[in-house]
A protein has these predicted regions:
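Structural signature of the two symmetry-related core transmembrane helices
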Residues: 1, 204-219
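Helix-loop junctions at membrane interfaces in 12-TM secondary transporters
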Residues: 2-14, 221-233
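Intracellular juxtamembrane helix-capping segments at the cytosolic ends
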Residues: 24-37, 243-257
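A membrane-interface helix-boundary motif in multi-pass transporters
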Residues: 66-95, 285-296
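Juxtamembrane intracellular "pre-TM" segments in multi-pass secondary transporters
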Residues: 109-144
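Short amphipathic helix-loop junctions that connect adjacent transmembrane helices
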Residues: 158-175
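Helix-to-loop junctions at the C-terminal end of transmembrane segments
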Residues: 189-202, 287
Length: 296
């Protein structure tokens, strides 16, 4: 792909394929949580998984920032005027993703037995029964709620950079630095959240995070006027956003029987994506008609 309008469709197709593969992989990845933890430490295990994901992204972002974004002359003879330095970054990320997936692939292949993990004869009826048995099951109610609040999380994660750039004038380099600090804060937040998940409950963690995130987003969109205010606002959001993701996975794991983990996490992924367009569409519409602040 090249940085002109002729490659928009091609880029979207590639993005669709990569995102689809990621979502499918996450179904099986999430369904292994019960196998990797004990009943009394499932929150810490889930939190540690998310925490390592957040902190593990920091080195690659630093590498990207200081090798490809900030220098006037970048490696491999890449031409910054043609955005080749930016276009090269996904290749580095793809390699990073592959290399650090290998230990998990090798370990689970050798150490984990799958024979009691999944129903060998799934059917549409069995899938429906997970969420509906004459009325919504507890799992169905949770997935319905998650479908709503996950839309808000998608807007925060996907649209935060656009908002920071449009309202507070963040440059690409500043956005990357902000993301690095935010990921470190998220690492700490989700570790604490995972520990508290085992002490309290997933439901309490989720509700508290929703309350804090709602108040914080309101402050950042309607009150914050300076970059400093916005920076601390992002830090608070980062601290809690990982905890709600981790607690959601734990709650789903506890709601499902072992044989339903594959089907259940398929629905879990589906519920997070089926209305994924709604949040960005609403924000985009309000932003277009009024302002970015009201949109957020």
């Amino acid at each position: 792909a090249k940085p002109n309008s002729n490659y928009i469709l091609f880029t979207l197709v590639i993005f669709f394929i990569s995102n689809y593969c990621y979502e499918v992989a996450s179904i099986f990845y999430n369904s292994l949580l019960k196998k990797c933890s004990n009943e009394n430490d499932i929150g810490k295990t889930s939190g540690l998984g998310f925490a390592l994901g957040y902190i593990g992204s920091v080195p690659i972002m630093l590498l990207t920032l200081y090798l490809f974004v900030l220098p006037e002359t970048v490696p491999f003879g890449l031409d910054k005027s043609k955005f080749e330095n930016i276009r090269f970054v996904p290749l580095v990320v793809a390699l990073w993703f592959l290399v650090f997936s290998l230990p998990m692939i090798y370990y689970f292949k050798k150490k984990i037995s799958y024979e009691d993990n999944f129903d060998s004869s799934p059917s549409f009826k069995k899938i429906i029964e997970i969420i509906w048995k004459n009325k919504f099951t507890s799992t169905g109610k949770f997935l319905l709620a998650r479908m709503i609040y996950s839309d808000a999380l998608i807007v925060l994660i996907a649209g935060g950079g656009v908002y920071a750039s449009g309202v507070f004038g963040y440059t690409p380099g500043e956005l990357l630095k902000l993301a690095i600090v935010a990921n470190v804060v998220a690492f700490l937040g989700v570790l604490i959240g995972g520990y508290l998940n085992d002490k309290l409950s997933s439901k309490k963690i989720i509700l508290f995070c929703i309350l804090v995130l709602t108040a914080t987003v309101f402050y950042g969109s309607m009150i914050a006027q300076t970059k400093t205010e916005f920076f601390y606002n992002v830090m608070v959001i980062s601290f809690f956003i990982g905890s709600i993701q981790s607690a959601s996975r734990v709650m789903m794991t506890k709601l499902l029987e072992t044989k339903d983990l594959g089907k259940g996490f398929g629905l879990f992924s589906f519920s997070g994506r089926i209305t994924a367009f709604a949040g960005p569409l609403l924000v985009g519409t309000v932003t277009y008609l009024y302002s970015q602040r009201l949109g957020l």
